[in-house]
Amino acid sequence: MKILFAGTPKPAAIVLEHLLTDPRLEVLGVITQPDARRGRGRSLHPSPVAEVAEGAGLKVHKWHSLGASSEDAAAVRETLAAYREAGATAVAVVAYGNLIPADLLDAVEHGWVNLHYSLLPRWRGAAPVQAAIAAGDQETGATIFRIEQGLDTGPMLSKKAYEIGIRETAEEVLIELTNSGKSLLADTLVELGEGSATPQPQPEEGATHAPKLHPADARIDFSAPAKVIQRRARAHTPAPGAWCTLDGQRYKFGLMLPVAEGEEFPELAPGQLWADKTRVLVGTGDTPLLVETIQPPGKKMMRAADWARGQQELLAQSPRFDIEEDTAK
């Protein structure tokens, strides 16, 4: 089966690498975002997908937009028509980053076939993995569906569930879903080509939305229950990074865990820090949390216990992270 591929970030590049090794599929070309400025020098770099595609000798198209009124409009439509003539029957999509205009949805026989990181219709949108963890979902998964005009509303072609571990971060779940989703996408594309795939419309019942994340969404309010805080920290690791302020300085948090059953700890106000030789605890709206990793201002993420050993003067003052009622004053 001949296909095109559209994607941009590292997870999409991993999927592309898998599709390129599948003897049942032939990738004719790749669509990705234009080169972007990264790093300290702010020099232009190709997307991870572009790097994989160029390394494989594939033609790469770096259009700014697919819209009919964009400067690339004519080139986009002429190129897709040429690929269709060459036998491409589907566009595999993984985190491409641009909207697919209505007039291009049927540019090839089987349309644009997307790998989405949730069990649709739950968590439609840009941040499904983070939303699932923050909500306390015990299960998520990957869904392959055909793109239509609505946001992640198209008919589903296949699904695969994944159980979320109680310590797993968004990064870790994303890796697992990429690894399972790449095979699911390949198999589904082959089924489409063979005519054995059975599209299923998405029910509206149970539909939820996961909008794009912003740094403000990752702010921790330590007056919330411990389980809510712990989920938020896992959901926003590594990016944008769960954070809170102490004396006007921003600290980021990695893994935070509930204290073990029967473990002794002092009574702590929400946001209050406490440490002994082996533990760093922070107060919440109910039971304290054990802080495993922390990123102080201007530093890298480190073990909280190591950080605390150099902060005896600070900890002796019973410091307290800001909570929402403090910052609202």
From Swiss-Prot:
> Which SUPFAM superfamilies did the record assign?
FMT C-terminal domain-like, Formyltransferase
Q: What keywords would UniProt list here?
A: Protein biosynthesis, Transferase
Q: Name the residues that bind (6S)-5,6,7,8-tetrahydrofolate.
A: S118, L119, L120, P121
Supply the EC number(s).
Answer: 2.1.2.9
Question: Looking at its record, which EC class is this enzyme?
Answer: transferase
- State any GO CC term: cytosol
Fetch the Pfam families from UniProt: Formyl_trans_C, Formyl_trans_N
Q: One MF term from GO for this chain?
A: methionyl-tRNA formyltransferase activity
Q: Which reaction does it catalyse?
A: L-methionyl-tRNA(fMet) + (6R)-10-formyltetrahydrofolate = N-formyl-L-methionyl-tRNA(fMet) + (6S)-5,6,7,8-tetrahydrofolate + H(+)
Task: Tell me the InterPro entries matching this sequence.
Answer: Fmt, Formyl_trans_C, Formyl_transf_N, Formyl_transf_N_sf, Formyl_transferase-like_C_sf, Met-tRNA-FMT_C, Met-tRNA-FMT_N
What role does this protein play?
Attaches a formyl group to the free amino group of methionyl-tRNA(fMet). The formyl group appears to play a dual role in the initiator identity of N-formylmethionyl-tRNA by promoting its recognition by IF2 and preventing the misappropriation of this tRNA by the elongation apparatus.
Which family does the UniProt entry place this protein in? Belongs to the Fmt family.
PANTHER family, alphabetically?
METHIONYL-TRNA FORMYLTRANSFERASE (PTHR11138), METHIONYL-TRNA FORMYLTRANSFERASE, MITOCHONDRIAL (PTHR11138:SF5)
NCBIfam families per UniProt: fmt
Name the record gives this protein: Methionyl-tRNA formyltransferase
UniProt source species: Corynebacterium urealyticum (strain ATCC 43042 / DSM 7109)
